[in-house]
């Protein structure tokens, strides 16, 4: 598995790739070649229950 430190660099994988921000996460979407889909920013800190 390949790991990339910068999601923004992945928009150059394919001419149709585009970077989109939704709900605090960053996605790279590619309609013509879906194997290039990427998401960054999943985990959030949970609140402490009392």
Curated annotation (Swiss-Prot):
PANTHER family listed in its UniProt record: 50S RIBOSOMAL PROTEIN L36 2, LARGE RIBOSOMAL SUBUNIT PROTEIN BL36B
Protein known as: Large ribosomal subunit protein bL36
Any Pfam family matching the protein:
Ribosomal_L36
What keywords are annotated for this sequence in UniProt?
Answer: Ribonucleoprotein, Ribosomal protein
Q: List the disulfide bonds.
A: none
- Protein's GO biological process: translation
Report the GO terms under cellular component. Answer: ribonucleoprotein complex; ribosome
HAMAP family attached to this UniProt entry: Ribosomal_bL36
Instruction: Please give the Gene Ontology molecular function terms for this protein.
Output: structural constituent of ribosome
Instruction: Kindly list the residue ranges recorded as spanning the membrane.
Output: none
Task: Please give the family membership noted in the entry.
Answer: Belongs to the bacterial ribosomal protein bL36 family.
Q: Which domain of life is it from?
A: Bacteria
């Amino acid at each position: 598995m390949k790991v990339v430190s910068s999601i923004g660099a992945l928009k150059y994988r394919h001419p149709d790739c585009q970077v989109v921000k939704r709900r605090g996460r960053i996605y790279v979407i590619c309609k013509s070649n879906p194997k290039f889909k990427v998401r960054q920013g999943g985990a959030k800190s949970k609140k402490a229950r009392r």
